[in-house]
């Protein structure tokens, strides 16, 4: 079989019929029976992003991580000392069995959660499908891109993403943006085989008749034959040979910072605890096992699962709110945005533009203006925007009553066109009428039309465009703009040579025939949505290519206060430093090119803002790519959907507001777990240091530490589903390692104080009272003393860790001002009561736990109440000092 390069070269050199024969297809496309055969022969149209992990690998990765490796080392050491090296009759594998069981339980829970999350992500990704138009059995069909096979004949038009490597077999004014492959930012014209002057066989990317997967159509139309699919395409080859790098989000960076902080703490604490206990007890092996257990206790090993569960839960809820998340981390980023940049069309307005008035240069209704506008909109092969559709619809309506606009598509035929671009802000078509007269008809932004017009037409009479007429036109248009009407100018020139090769230089010395006034009414939901976003700390900025007066009028109608308006022409004269200052106080940016939009967003980001960009057009893709969160809609062009991180199933700011709130809920519940766990573990450091220095025995057996840690983690599984205070949702939130470390330093030591109080009560009061003797009363009595002491601290640790969750989860008073989710109440109480019941269960002898008397539980209740009151007092001081809690 030929290589992909050989196939492309052969298609350029051989007659088209020969190429059709090679792939058993025709100009009418593949027949259904041939589709599967070609798929088997040439492969599927899927680029391998990395082989999907096998089930065994997924299980392995769920169970094996740095923390479980430490646990398994402890289990191995315990097995060696308590089974392998133990004397006959003294062998006890209990600790090893418990540790291995806990590892399997923890890994199993994570594995199940990961499977659920993967399934949720897969279901969500299937909700957004890029499609292509193919010819099968001579009829057009819309199919998912991954179902395309070699030999398919596809139809391409403006806004499409090219789904495979193809050769053009027919084309009309077909321009492609292939900067992703070549780095060249300008659109490149492609022509079909029969029109190509020559083909560059040395650099296939420069071939006039080949187009490649991943590039997108800027304007025009084409019919193409699919030659190469999937991994063998140019894009597929690049994917296979380079490591794609995604810049880590602020969330990922802060998570890395926190992880390394915990690792450093562990690396310091484990050796210290090992040395102190070894010197105190003289049992270095036992000290080593305990030190490793401390290492496990200091690490929130369930953190990856909690994060995954929070993000997956958030994505599922958002899907119900018509928000599809393409990347899970985008949920948190969406909640963090404090500036939303968006175009006004379809966001603030209804996306249903109506042509209100076709006007001559003096502002009177004139259907000859509509006639020429129709020729431009109907015959252009670019993506027909809302105004093109409005022109065509109005013409069809008027054609029922007025002959001047009847049968225009039959009375004219197209010669050529000059596609729209964002520099000229206009587009032209060249048409010939039944009498053989060739004309160029141009429409575009009024200022641009005045710049290329030398004459004006009024009631059939052509005069020179004077400054007086120019000012009259501008004044009339300004008045329309202030009413919220968008205005396009229409110019033309006649008696052209149809054999001429037309270019943008021909757009000159034209006759301005009039202008078109469009109404794009505001959405009823726009005003409340903007108000809601503002209440959530999100500033809305409008970035548009439209006229500033129209944009201002629309903004006023939807209640968006316009602080300042900045034009694209002004931006071009500014340095980045100047623009960075101005963007802070500007609400509306008008008459922008795509590059200017992207530059504004970069300036906002450099100023420290988290920026979301919402768009749906070809020109929006660069802005979405540089923003923190790219937002699009399911009706957007393919390239916009491909670039977006978040896709709305309804182009409505109200929908976005719901997604933003859910993002903040996800952040809130993840930060709860991290701050609670890190502060609790930090407090344990001081408790264990004190115990290691002042107690003549281990305050808790290694197996106790491990069981305690696992049950506490299981009690936190419900946190992703916890309620979040409404006040917390009102501000954008970003991850800050400093905030987490500060929280840890304030809250952690409080638990240490009460742990030490528990030590003192157990050592000097409770254990002697229960046993009738102190620690130094013989070896057998010492063993009993240690068991009761360890049981007492084991239970107190669980109660303090789980009950304080309710104090820490909100800055408000728990249960009175802020109610936790029912699942959080159930899991925390279940964990506390389960641990409390262990000394009275059959597991007591296995875990070496002892029953406690009533006085212990009275004192335990007092300690927990005092602990929670102390946390409340410190919480108030902390909030007053730092103006934040979570």
Regions found by a protein language model. Name each.
Residues 210-218, 333-512, 518, 531, ...:
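Cytosolic catalytic regions of ATP/NTP-dependent phosphoryl-transfer enzymes
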Residues 64-84, 100-110, 129-130, 260-278, ...:
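Alpha-helical transmembrane segments of multi-pass membrane proteins
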Residues 1-140, 146-149, 154-162, 167-247, ...:
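Non-lumenal N-terminal regulatory segments of integral membrane proteins
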Residues 95-129, 136, 246-339, 516, ...:
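Hydrophobic alpha-helical transmembrane segments
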Residues 73-98, 261-299, 312-322, 500-501, ...:
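Helix-interface capping motifs at the ends of transmembrane segments in multi-pass membrane proteins
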Residues 273, 304, 311, 558, ...:
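Membrane-embedded transport module
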Residues 527-529, 535, 547-558, 595-603, ...:
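Acidic, divalent-metal-coordinating active-site segment for phosphoryl/phosphodiester hydrolysis
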Residues 44-76, 118, 140-141, 201-210, ...:
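Soluble-to-membrane junctions at the N-terminal ends of transmembrane alpha-helices
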């Amino acid at each position: 079989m030929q290589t992909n390069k050989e196939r492309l070269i052969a298609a350029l050199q051989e007659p088209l019929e020969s190429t059709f024969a090679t792939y058993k297809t025709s100009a009418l496309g593949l027949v259904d029976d041939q589709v599967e055969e070609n798929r088997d022969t040439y492969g599927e149209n899927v680029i391998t992003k990395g082989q999907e992990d096998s089930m065994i690998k997924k299980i392995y990765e769920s169970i094996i991580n740095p923390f479980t490796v430490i646990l398994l080392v402890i289990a191995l050491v315990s097995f060696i000392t308590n089974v392998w090296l133990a004397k006959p009759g003294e062998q006890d594998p209990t600790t090893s069995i418990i540790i291995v069981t806990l590892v399997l339980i923890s890994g199993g829970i994570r594995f199940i959660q990961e499977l659920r999350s993967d399934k949720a992500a897969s279901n969500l990704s299937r909700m957004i499908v890029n499609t292509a138009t193919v010819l099968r059995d001579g009829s057009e069909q819309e199919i998912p891109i991954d179902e395309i096979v070699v030999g398919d004949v596809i139809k391409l038009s403006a806004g499409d993403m090219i789904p495979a490597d193809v050769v053009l077999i027919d084309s009309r004014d077909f321009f492609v943006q292939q900067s992703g492959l070549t780095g060249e930012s300008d659109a490149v014209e492609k022509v079909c085989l029969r029109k190509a002057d020559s083909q560059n066989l040395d650099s296939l990317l420069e071939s006039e008749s080949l187009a490649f997967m991943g590039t997108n159509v800027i304007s025009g139309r084409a019919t193409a034959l699919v030659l190469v699919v999937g991994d063998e395409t140019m894009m597929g080859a690049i994917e296979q040979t380079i490591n794609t790098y995604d810049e880590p989000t602020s969330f990922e960076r802060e998570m890395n910072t926190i992880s390394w902080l915990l690792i450093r703490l562990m690396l310091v604490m484990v050796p210290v605890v090992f040395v102190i206990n070894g010197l105190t007890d003289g049992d270095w092996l036992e000290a080593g096992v305990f030190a490793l257990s401390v290492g496990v206790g200091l690490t929130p090993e369930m953190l990856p699962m909690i994060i995954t569960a929070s993000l997956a839960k958030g994505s599922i809820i958002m899907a119900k709110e018509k928000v599809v998340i393409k990347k899970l981390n985008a949920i948190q980023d969406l909640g963090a945005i404090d500036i939303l940049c968006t175009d006004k069309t379809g966001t603030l307005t209804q996306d249903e533009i109506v042509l209100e008035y076709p006007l001559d240069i003096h502002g009177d209704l004139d259907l000859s203006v509509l006639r020429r506008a129709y020729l431009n909109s109907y015959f252009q092969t670019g993506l027909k925007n809302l105004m093109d559709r409005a022109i065509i619809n109005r013409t069809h309506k008027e054609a029922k009553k007025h002959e001047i606009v009847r049968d225009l598509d039959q009375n004219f035929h197209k010669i050529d066109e000059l596609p729209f671009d964002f520099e000229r802000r206009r587009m032209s078509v060249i048409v010939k009428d039944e009498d053989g007269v060739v004309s160029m008809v141009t429409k575009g932004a009024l200022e641009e039309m005045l710049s290329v017009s030398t004459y004006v037409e009024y009631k059939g009479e052509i005069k020179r465009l004077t400054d007086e007429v120019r000012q009259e036109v501008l004044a009339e248009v300004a008045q329309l703009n202030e009413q919220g009407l968008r205005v396009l100018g229409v110019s033309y020139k006649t008696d052209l040579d149809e054999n001429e090769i037309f270019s943008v230089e021909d757009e000159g010395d034209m006759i301005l025939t009039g202008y078109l006034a469009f109404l794009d009414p505001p959405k009823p939901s726009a005003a409340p949505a903007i108000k809601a976003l503002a209440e959530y700390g999100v500033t809305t900025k409008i970035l548009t290519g439209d006229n500033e007066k129209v944009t201002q009028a629309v903004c006023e109608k939807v209640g968006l206060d316009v602080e300042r308006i900045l034009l694209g022409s002004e931006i071009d004269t500014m340095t980045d430093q100047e623009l960075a200052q101005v963007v802070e106080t500007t609400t509306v940016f008008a008459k922008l090119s795509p590059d200017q939009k992207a530059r504004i967003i970069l300036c906002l980001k450099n100023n420290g803002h988290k920026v979301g960009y919402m768009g749906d057009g070809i020109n929006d893709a660069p802005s979405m790519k540089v923003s923190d969160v790219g937002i699009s809609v399911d009706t957007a062009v393919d390239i916009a959907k491909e670039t977006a991180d978040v896709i709305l199933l309804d182009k409505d700011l109200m929908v976005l507001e719901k997604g933003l709130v859910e993002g903040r809920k996800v952040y809130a519940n993840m930060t709860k777990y991290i701050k609670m766990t890190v502060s609790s573990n930090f407090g344990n450091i001081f408790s264990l240091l004190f115990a290691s220095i002042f107690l003549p025995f281990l305050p808790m057996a290694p197996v106790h530490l491990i069981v305690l840690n696992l049950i506490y983690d299981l009690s936190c599984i419900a946190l992703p589903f916890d309620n979040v205070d409404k006040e917390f949702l009102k501000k954008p939130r970003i991850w800050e390692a400093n905030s987490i470390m500060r929280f840890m330093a304030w809250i952690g030591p409080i638990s240490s104080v009460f742990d030490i109080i528990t030590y003192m009560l157990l050592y000097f009061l409770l254990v002697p009272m229960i046993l009738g003797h102190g620690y130094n009363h013989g070896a057998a009595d010492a063993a009993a003393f240690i068991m009761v002491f360890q049981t007492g601290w084991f239970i107190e640790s669980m109660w303090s860790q789980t009950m304080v969750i309710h104090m820490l989860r909100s800055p408000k008073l728990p249960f009175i001002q802020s109610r936790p989710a029912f699942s959080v109440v159930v899991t925390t109480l279940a964990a506390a009561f389960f641990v409390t019941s262990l000394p009275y269960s059959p597991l007591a002898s296995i875990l070496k736990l002892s029953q406690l008397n009533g006085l212990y539980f009275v004192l335990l209740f007092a300690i927990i109440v005092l602990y929670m009151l102390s946390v409340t007092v410190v919480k108030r001081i902390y909030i007053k000092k730092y103006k934040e809690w979570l």
